[in-house]
């Protein structure tokens, strides 16, 4: 009678457990021990049968040297590592950590113990990070573990701009570098980043290392997709680079690329592989027609340097990023397509969002209760969007919870400006919190010249602008000031024509645009534009409807207006604030606002940012 799969598996596990527990018990009580493993000064009594059953390495040693099988001396391995390996063979238990995993991995490879090898591979894969990815990649290549090497390479490719800055990147061998930069999965927007990384690599190290790398440069260059480089960059940067000019072979390669830009492709002849002796004999018999059939025996291929396949990171598109407590959705106004970026519901309802010039997205706001902090348990959420994994990462929480504040960025720092305290007093704030993106720590920055909330904060050219809002007397302000982090000072600028709060604002075409909002007399539709160069405000085409909390977004040279609240009349004739989820676009030629969408899903309660995302990673909705 055939046993069911579950019953058969249960019986197998029972027998395995019985066998393993029995062997461990005999080891602990010194029964039937017939072998000693010596590592330095330490000895490990054990059973030859266990070692031979689990390791082809030990099995081969015992069979090759039967007379000395009672003692095994191991060199170039730590006693602690051997102790862990033997403990695993008898118990199936192993304690891995970042400090020991590489030594155990190497031991498992040397002693040919596939189970420990697989456990180490899984451990390293799960803990891949910027700090260890290059070391893990090299380890995978060294131990001939394709699974680990490919996982680490893919991790490196996905974060290439960051990894290429690491000093460990400069320590790669030519073959290791080629394995990375030849990948289609390289996450770079422009091939210029690959060229610059290769040049830094070739110029690093001592004189001997530089000479060796420069000899390998023609081979490495085959993996730089120079046809993707703009012609101007090719002529001004690549062709004139000292390392390129010093090698005629590299100059010939650059000329091939320039010819390709003009439509003249250089091809190489590559002999087709012969198929057995019959092909060879047939070729010999037809010696007289060799010249006429030469083309049949060869195939033409493009040199590697003429490869123009786009990298993975070159599929970035300009999108409007809508962030709400329901999730994050990216909208492509050019194609009228929506993409799901994240279904996470950890975004606080009342939040402020920011996109940096490096295209990093941050969210701050809401209330976070930290029960471990007895003195001041209340803080606010601070999250960063991970483009690669499409998820929100928890960052050090905002130490001072507040609402109606603004977010700005300059010089690797993020600024939380003004707002109102989330306390009974609801005091207006002039304080500015500063988050250092390099040290991942919060601190205090220079306070504002005045307390403000409901204002807008914009960033441009490493300066932080604060516009409008309401002061301590709850009156709307027309003030505008700018913070220069290099000088650690605030400076007041020309005031707006209309005092307002809760309005839309953005930097577009090198100028600051504001639209709609709340005034002391109610909602407004008025708009104005500020010339940064002239420090002057002028009127702009009014928005078609009076609104508060309108969002302005500058995307790919076009100015968009999204959402907000308007006062609408209900069927009963009552006027109530109503949230709108529409999209408008400003027509530069006709100087007017045009409706794009009457309503877009997922925009309710959202903040809007202009971002560049890789649509290959996103799911079309």
From Swiss-Prot:
| Annotated region (Disordered), positions in chain | 265-298
Q: What induces it?
A: Up-regulated during myogenic differentiation. Induced during the differentiation of myoblasts into myotubes.
Q: In which tissues is it expressed?
A: Specifically expressed in skeletal muscles in embryonic, neonatal and adults. Expressed in various types of muscles, including extensor digitorum longus, gastrocnemius, soleus, diaphragm, masseter and heart (at protein level). Not detected in brain, liver and lung (at protein level).
**Segments forming domain BACK:** 133-239
Example GO biological process: skeletal muscle fiber differentiation
- Which PROSITE patterns is this protein grouped with? BTB
Output compositional bias ranges, type Basic and acidic residues. Answer: 274-284
Positions of Kelch repeats? 360-412, 413-462, 463-510, 512-557, 559-613
Keywords, ordered alphabetically:
Cytoplasm, Developmental protein, Kelch repeat, Repeat, Ubl conjugation pathway
**Primary location group:** cytoplasm
Q: Self-association or partners: how does it assemble?
A: Component of the BCR(KLHL40) E3 ubiquitin ligase complex, at least composed of CUL3, KLHL40 and RBX1. Interacts with LMOD3.
The entry's protein name is Kelch-like protein 40
Name the source organism: Mus musculus
In the UniProt record, the gene name given for this protein reads Klhl40
